[in-house]
Structure formats: C-alpha cells, structure tokens
C-alpha cells in the first residue's frame, strides 16, 4: 500500500479522494496482494481507532459531574487518561499528544448541589500540548498495551515552566488525544492521522472538591487515598467514641485518687526533705548561747541569713561548738563545708552557734563542764568526729571547747604589743577588732595560732 501511495506521489495522511480510489483499485487488481489477509486492512489510515480504558469508572464520575483538582505546583488527574489504539502500522513510528480544550465560554459555580453558569469565561491561557514520553514509537508498541498519561499534571499557574497543562478554575474542559505519524519529533514533518475525544472524560477544573459525591468516589477508587477510606474513618470514629466514653470514668477515678490519702503519701518524701533542711532557731530554746549582736539583728529561723549562718561549719575561734554524733550523721548530708560555700569563716560577723541533737530540752537542763586542757595536740576542730557504725547511740553530754573562760578577757592597753592587722576587713564599732598578741607570752596554748580560721 505504501508503495502504491508513493507511486501516486501522496502521503498516506493526506490522500485525496481520487488518488485514494485509484490506489484502492490498484491494490485490489494487483496479483501480489491476493494473499493479503483481512488483518492488513487495519493498517489503513481510515481504520485507525481508539477506545477509552476504565470506561465504567469514568462513567460513574461523569454521571455526578467529574471534577479535577488544579494547583500551583500541578496535580495529576484521577481517573487517569488511559486509551488503547488499534489500526496502526506496526513498523511506522507515531507520536501521541494530549491537549485540553474548553467545552464552552462560561464560568461555573457550585450552587444547591449542582453546577450552574456564573458569567463569561476568562481568556483562555496559552494552549499547551502534552507529549507522551514514549513518543515516537512504532505502531506495534502503541497497540501492545493501553497507553496511560499518568505523568500528566494540571495547574492554574499561568507562569508555569514545568510543562504542565494550564487551566482556569471553575471552567469545563475535555482532553483530546492526537495520533501523529512521525519518525522524529523535531526534524521530520508530521502527518496527522487521527484525533480522539470521549464525552466521559469531560470535567470541571476546581481548586477544591465541590460535590461530596465526587469526593467519595475519589476516596473509594483512588489507590493513593487509602488513608481516607470511609471504612477506616468509621473505625477511627469508633475508637474516638470509645475513648470519649471512657474519659469521664477515668477522670472520676483520677479525682478520687487525688482526694485519697495515698496521693498525700506520694508527696511525703518531698516534705521530709524540707524538714531535714530546716535549722533550729538558736534564739529559741538556747537563748543563752546567742550573742547580743546577733540577738539585736533579729534573725528568725526562716531568715536566709540565719539559715546560711547555721549551715556553715566553722573552726572554733570565738565561741564554743556543740555537736552530737547522731545529729551529725543526720544533718551532715545537708550541711556544706566552708570550702564548698566559697566564703571564708573570718568574714562571719556573728559568733558560731553550736548545733545540738534533736532531743527533749528537759534532758539537756544540766551540763557538765569538761576540765580545760591546755595541751596543744589535743586541740581539735569541731569537725573531727569518729565515724562509727550507724547504730542508735545513747544521749551524751555536750562537747565543750578545750579553752578556758579566761581567754575571752581583753588585755589591758599596753600589756601586749598590738598587731598591725585585724581579723575583720573593716572596723566594727560595736564589737571592735581584738588583736591577738604573739609576743611576751608564757603560754601559747590558750590562743589560736592564727587570727582567723584557715582550715
């Protein structure tokens, strides 16, 4: 047939009526074509055809009014454009193209569960044609399997540079499928064979679905919308309802538990920590151990200054310190040393207060004074306690300093040579800076080796 067409000087896609009739008569009268089967007639240009795949699905959407989403970045169609071709020459190369044309010159709107015209259509955007990525390909390739345009995308961006089909929202369109015979997309001339369109593929372009029935059809049939299936939604609703039904009872149980004594017991360790950190008021039971200067300041057990002063552990310099082993084991974890506090003991303006064990005040009414010992090796720091096994110890008497009471007497003027420095950074008018003499002394044991604690 192609040889016959070449002899006539015309291409197969542009046969004139007379030439085509002559060629047909030549084909019939040629003895070489007697063995041509009826299948060869499918290769003739006027016998090329196409059919729509998934026609039942398209028909369901068409009955409700198909809607296609368009976005700025481009959105694929569902149902997809899928056709099947037949009647092509198996060895000739063809190209497949798709374009979209408006159905009318109106703009539409969704009103009362139906589409209705809402004015004149907007100017049509530049017409774009989508070329199937397999083009060009032999006819046998196109006829082998259904042809799917799954990578086709619709957009409403008039400045799109990705090759997507540009459409206007709320307008009606239909796709057209072009079959073009060509060996090369750019160089060889195109020979138009056929154009196909199907009424089931007509749709309205939207940016959001207007018809709920279309939404349900998309959810039920689109494989990429499995998370939106109505069945899964019903299960989720049931789960939510169960949770909501159980929530009031759970709240009541929670409220009952909070009101019960168990909730108070759960916070008991926290209260214990607060009690352990509290320090006994030195001006309460043991008022005789507080100096006048500290009493004038009016420190209370809840005062930060009183708490900070009582938590320090000092070397015995200007007062006696009283400790008990059982009390030390209980409170040593909460008291920090002067090195940890980062404050030297010489900066304390108030005398040291001895901490006594938590016991009945009546049992401490009588104290036995330990005889004064002046030997230097026996002078110890108030922190030097023997750590014994943690067991209940009997109540012991208070530990007094090995220094005698005569050490607190202020020497007369001129008896000793004054030292040029003092233990306090500033001159205190109320107490005065007492300088410790270090010369002309017969007994060094009753005085400290240093004017301030350095341990």
UniProtKB/Swiss-Prot annotation:
PROSITE patterns: TBOX_1, TBOX_2, TBOX_3. Induction: By mesoderm inducing factors and TGF-beta family members including nodal/nr-1 acting in an autoregulatory loop, nodal2/nr-2 derriere, bFGF and activin B. This is T-box protein VegT-A. It holds the Pfam family T-box. Residues 57-230 bind DNA. Forms a repression complex on the promoters of the nodal/nr1 and siamois genes with the maternal factors tcf7l1/tcf3 and pouf5.1/oct-25. Interacts (via C-terminus) with tcf7l1/tcf3 (via N-terminus). Also interacts with the other POU-domain transcription factors pou5f1.2/oct-91 and pou5f1.3/oct-60. SMART domains: TBOX. Signal peptide: none annotated. One of its GO terms (biological process) is mesoderm formation. Residues 308-324 have a biased composition (Polar residues). GO terms for molecular function: DNA-binding transcription factor activity; DNA-binding transcription factor activity, RNA polymerase II-specific; DNA-binding transcription factor binding; RNA polymerase II cis-regulatory region sequence-specific DNA binding; sequence-specific DNA binding; transcription cis-regulatory region binding. GO terms for cellular component: chromatin; nucleus; transcription regulator complex. Keywords: Activator, Developmental protein, DNA-binding, Nucleus, Transcription, Transcription regulation. It is found in: Nucleus. It comes from the Eukaryota. The keyword Nucleus applies. Residues 229-241 have a biased composition (Basic and acidic residues).
